[in-house]
């Protein structure tokens, strides 16, 4: 599985666990709606760490908790995480 697909599925699963919509994530976290949509759909070629950080902060979990999921066990392209956390 590609990293972008695993990230998208993980965000989708976390939203479902919290009975939360992409719109609520946008409203609560200030993350652009288009960014959330493209992230959940796994359409990014690269995954921005800043984006993942904003999402996990809004959901109230850590980056470690986000990536500690079996979805990431078979990720093939870990090298495409882009960016530095600025928080």
Role assignments for model-derived ranges:
Residues 43-57:
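Short, basic-rich loop-to-helix N-cap that marks the start of a DNA-contacting helix
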Residues 15, 26, 56:
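The alpha-helix within a helix-turn-helix
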Residues 19-38:
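Short alpha-helical DNA-recognition segment
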Residues 1-21:
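A short, Lys/Arg-rich alpha-helix, primarily the initiator
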Residues 15, 40, 51:
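DNA major-groove recognition helix of helix-turn-helix
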Residues 68-87:
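Short, charged recognition helix plus adjacent turn
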Residues 38, 42, 54, 72:
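Alpha-helical DNA-recognition elements
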Residues 10, 21, 48-51, 62:
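Residues that mark the N-terminal boundary/hinge immediately upstream of a DNA-recognition element
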């Amino acid at each position: 599985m590609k990293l972008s697909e695993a990230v998208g599925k993980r965000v989708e699963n976390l939203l479902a666990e919290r009975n939360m919509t992409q719109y609520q994530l946008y409203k609560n976290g200030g993350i652009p709606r288009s960014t959330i949509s493209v992230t959940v759909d796994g359409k990014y070629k690269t995954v921005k760490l800043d984006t993942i950080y904003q999402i996990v902060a809004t959901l109230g979990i850590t980056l470690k908790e986000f990536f500690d999921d079996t979805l990431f066990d078979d990720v093939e392209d870990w090298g495409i995480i882009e960016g530095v956390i600025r928080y």
